[in-house]
Amino acid sequence: MHNHVFKTIARHGLIALFFFFSISAMAAEVAKMDRIVAIVDQGVITEKELEDRIQTVIAQLEKQGTQLPPRDVLQKQILERLINDRLQLQYAAQTGLRVDDAQLDKTIERIAEQNKLSTGEFRKALEAEGIPYRKFREDIRNEIILARLREREVDNRVNVTESEIDNFLTTQSSRNDIQDEFEVAHILIRAPEESTPEELQKLKAKAEAALKELQSGADFAQVSAGYSDAPNALEGGILGWKASSQLPSLFVDALQALQPGQLSPVLRSPNGYHILKLLNRRGGSSPLVVDQTHVRHILIKLSEVVSELEAEQKINSIKERLDHGADFAELARQYSEDASANNGGDLGWTNAGDTVPAFEKAMNALDINEISAPVRTPFGWHIIQVLERRKQDMTQESARLKARQEIRARKADDAFQDWLSELRDRAYVEYRLEDKY
């Protein structure tokens, strides 16, 4: 009897002991994953958040075939990104920038369509890859917020003047390599404007250490992930193909001296230290000659008060008057609901892609001075007349457009880094990553 009781108690005791240790282990794991690795103003970044992002980046790098940098280097690089993202998201929330569920749903629908899937199929595909749909939604929401925040705070405030474009093109045309294009990889060690001489020396030493690793045969993408402060550091630092007009003179001069596969020395610019790798080079593009069409139209829009049938009847009535010799420009001024109405419907010279596909298809099918039958597009009902056609050398216009885009991109990138630095300077950031060890 006593032995039976003893055995029963012992068995229950072992069970209790098992549950005690199991619960303790689970609690320890939860505590570990909830451990704070950084305090960012009023928010925190947990070890779980950091680990989740690390695993995502590792999966991306492995998919690209990129050799992984040391874990501690990757960990610190990703933590910096998380801190910067968190600061921006906090600022966005404080200033009323939000993305509602309806906007988010539309974005996810577009992503699914790009993958040729329905939203339901896309959700199943995500879950099959081990990506929780709820987390994916919040990640996309945050990406939209970050993009809109940058657009609001930086991009919309960047202006490019005609004189800046003129100076840019003058500088580029003075170089014999104007037509060259380069495929480039890039590492940036950023040097803030307020850096002291001692800090600059340390940053330069960091760049030279990265270059030494590369010269010893290290993988460029791995060194980029471990050292670079560029936005694409974890994507191998690849800039892709760039015309010489799209690159700073400092870069072009260095690249001109390289053969594919070679590395530049450490280069100093106002925003830091750079290392370039020339992946490939090719001659530039030939003159850009495009087909242009001088066209005018009459537009009848659909609205809440104008039905499809009413709009179609109205456009048919206008077409009938044109067939009987009525003046196109006069009817456009009288009836067209497009902004071109005051100009008699004249849209001027158009390039391929300037108009929606249905309009362009109908326009391209017309002879000179021929008037189309009514054409339905997303804007409503049109009547189209082609006035002239020509081939136009758009090389100069294209060069100015590319120059404007390049100047704007450079100024926006510099302004964004300055803005982000100011945001960090105003914030309280405490690192606790070392507390783990």
Swiss-Prot record:
Chain ranges of the PpiC domain: 179-280, 290-388
GO molecular function list: peptide binding; peptidyl-prolyl cis-trans isomerase activity; unfolded protein binding
GO biological process: Gram-negative-bacterium-type cell outer membrane assembly; protein folding; protein stabilization
InterPro entries to which the protein is assigned, alphabetical: OMP_Chaperone_SurA, PPIase_dom_sf, PPIase_PpiC, PPIase_PpiC_CS, PPIase_SurA, SurA_N, Trigger_fact/SurA_dom_sf
Keyword annotations: Chaperone, Isomerase, Periplasm, Repeat, Rotamase, Signal
Claim: Nucleus is one of the keywords in the record: no
Origin superkingdom: Bacteria
Pfam families linked: Rotamase, Rotamase_3, SurA_N
Catalytic class of the enzyme: isomerase
PROSITE patterns: PPIC_PPIASE_1, PPIC_PPIASE_2
Subcellular location: Periplasm
Predominant localisation class: periplasm
Signal peptide coordinates: 1-27
EC number of the protein: 5.2.1.8
PANTHER family: CHAPERONE SURA (PTHR47637:SF1)
Free-text comment on this protein's domains from its UniProt entry: The PPIase activity resides only in the second parvulin domain. The N-terminal region and the C-terminal tail are necessary and sufficient for the chaperone activity of SurA. The PPIase activity is dispensable for SurA to function as a chaperone. The N-terminal region and the C-terminal tail are also required for porin recognition.
Function: Chaperone involved in the correct folding and assembly of outer membrane proteins. Recognizes specific patterns of aromatic residues and the orientation of their side chains, which are found more frequently in integral outer membrane proteins. May act in both early periplasmic and late outer membrane-associated steps of protein maturation.
Protein name per its UniProtKB record: Chaperone SurA
Higher taxonomy: Bacteria, Pseudomonadati, Pseudomonadota, Betaproteobacteria, Nitrosomonadales
